[in-house]
A protein has these predicted regions:
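Conserved N-terminal Rossmann-fold NAD(P)-binding element of oxidoreductases
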Residues: 3-9
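Short beta-strand element of Class I
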Residues: 27-29
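Helix N-cap at the beta1-alpha1 junction of Rossmann-like dinucleotide-binding domains, i.e.
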Residues: 34-37
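Conserved Rossmann-fold cofactor-binding substructure of NAD(P)-dependent oxidoreductases
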Residues: 55-74, 78-84
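ADP-ribose/adenylate-binding Rossmann-like module
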Residues: 81, 92-110
Length: 149
């Protein structure tokens, strides 16, 4: 499988490392508007046996984003700001037919993406939203005590 990571900021660093170290991906691509920043970010990551590919992308260039997504098996959206980028990325994932994991914490973008549910289901696309720190991990902290009862 091949994974696409959109964005190269602070939240992308552990995601890139995890994807590279899991062993289930034969390739990871980091796509960003800032390829030089991506190179600098990747240079700081320890313990990588190989390097991810880097591509320049503007997530608002729908045709280019869909084409890039189609070359991968899953997309992880870490390209902020969420209020501006989450919805176009979700629409592109549906058009590409590629599953999407998104860390968006923006409630308005979340509502817009949830409104795409039927379209995503019809396209056979799974979209996982709010998988950042908060919401995301904090939901697990809330639910964990209840799961133990």
């Amino acid at each position: 499988m091949k994974a696409l990571v959109l964005g190269c900021g602070e939240m992308a660093q552990p995601a890139i490392t995890d994807l590279m170290q899991q062993g289930m991906f034969r390739g990871v691509t980091v796509a960003t508007r800032h390829p030089l920043r991506a190179e600098a970010t990747i240079a700081t990551l320890a313990g990588l046996s190989s390097q991810p590919a880097i591509e320049r992308i503007d997530v608002h260039d729908t045709a280019a984003l869909v084409a890039l997504m189609r070359r991968h098996d899953v997309t992880c959206n870490l390209a902020g700001p969420n209020y501006r980028n989450a919805v176009p990325v979700a629409r592109a994932a549906i058009a590409a037919g590629v599953p999407l994991v998104d860390v968006s914490d923006d409630w308005e973008a979340t509502l817009e993406i949830l409104a795409l549910h039927d379209v995503a289901v019809a396209a056979g696309v799974t979209i996982l939203l709010g998988l950042g720190a908060s919401p995301g991990v904090t939901r697990g902290f809330h639910g964990a005590p209840h799961a133990l009862l």
